Regions:
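Short, solvent-exposed amphipathic alpha-helices that sit
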Residues: 40, 78-92, 164-167, 191-210, ...
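Flexible loop/turn connectors
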Residues: 230-329
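N-terminal helix-turn-helix DNA-binding module of bacterial transcription factors
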Residues: 1-64
Length: 329
């Protein structure tokens, strides 16, 4: 039995009538080459049925086809769906994905970043509140952030949080609400969520209403959040509309409201934020502002790949939101 010959780079070069270096440059897209030369090399590869060694090419290009995702938690439906969408898109492009959930703990997040960077990832997509972490300032790898500001030179993919805030509050005003409260993260966190609160305050002031915001920490238990919401109902029994910072908190508010004999939509109207698929499935009655999670994932991957390819003029992107009308407002 005749052993099948292994086709090498030299064979492609000989058939194409070019040097081995030229074939290597075509494979790795390095340096200027004429279209005629590139076609000759590809024609030779096709004729010889030559398949490049992918691992060797990655080493030559100093790429691992490995990316990392760092988010606060997958317990939140928004981040759970976002991570799933990102992983799906990277898988389609031949990238492996490492994931770390920081629980919004700066020390844990820094440990994750060091670990992931030691794995020689090509780039990272993050969704962190922790702006002061040194790895973000050093920026030794391409980084794209989603819905969070982590560094001046790091592009952010976000939804139009200001417009989302306006839509939510205007809906409550249109429903006849006179006393509208907003729940949000603590104001010391640098996040596009601040734009939702700004929109709430601007619209309330425009209508000569007093804006009231209750801060709810991101990383506390549901029981602790419910304690905050009970305090809110006790301190403001007149509340008739609530713009919640996310759908999970909106659902908790509705549950706590029942303890105070406040039922949606008759005694209380609630608008959430995020509109993740799992929330729409489990709580279809929730009126909410839907973020375009699949589109945000697509854009984040696109920007990261541009950075990995060496582009330096990658800009932040803001995507539109929409109102999902249901029965809680």
């Amino acid at each position: 039995m005749v052993e099948k010959k292994t086709i090498k780079l030299d064979d492609v070069a000989e058939l194409a009538g070019v040097s081995k270096t030229t074939v290597s440059r075509v494979l790795n897209n390095r340096g200027y080459l004429s279209d005629k030369t590139i076609k000759k090399v590809h024609d030779a590869m096709d004729k010889l049925n030559y398949r490049p060694n992918v691992i060797a090419r990655q080493l030559f290009k100093q790429k691992t086809n490995l990316v990392a995702l760092v988010f606060p938690t997958v317990d939140n439906p928004f981040f759970a769906e976002l991570e799933a969408e990102l992983e799906k898109r990277f898988d389609q492009l031949g990238y492996r994905v490492l994931m770390g959930n920081s629980q919004n703990n700066p020390a844990k997040e820094q440990d994750y970043l060091k670990l992931l960077l030691n794995h020689q990832v090509d780039g990272l997509i993050v969704g962190s509140h922790n702006q002061g972490i040194s790895e973000y300032q050093k920026k030794t790898r391409p980084i794209v952030s989603i819905e969070r500001f982590v560094g001046k030179q790091i592009p952010v993919v976000s939804s139009d949080n200001y417009q989302g805030g306006l839509l939510a509050v205007q809906r409550l005003l249109n429903d006849g609400c006179k006393h509208i409260i907003h729940t949000n993260y603590p104001i010391n966190l640098v996040s596009p969520n601040e734009l939702r609160q700004q929109a709430y305050e601007d619209l309330m002031n425009r209508h000569h209403r007093k804006p009231i915001t209750y801060s709810v920490s991101f990383d506390v238990s549901d029981e602790e959040k419910e304690r905050v919401f009970r305090k809110m109902f006790r301190e403001h029994p007149e509340v008739d509309g609530i713009f919640a910072d996310n759908d999970t908190n909106a659902s908790l508010i509705i549950r706590v409201g029942k303890e105070f004999n406040r039922h949606v939509p008759d005694d209380l109207k609630v608008v959430g934020y995020d509109g993740a698929n799992i929330t729409r499935t489990l709580s279809p009655e929730l009126t909410t502002i839907q973020q375009p999670i699949p589109e945000m994932a697509t854009k984040a991957v696109e920007l990261l790949l541009q950075l990995i390819d060496g582009k330096t003029d990658v800009k932040s992107v803001t995507l539109p939101v929409k109102m999902i009308n249901s029965t809680t407002a």
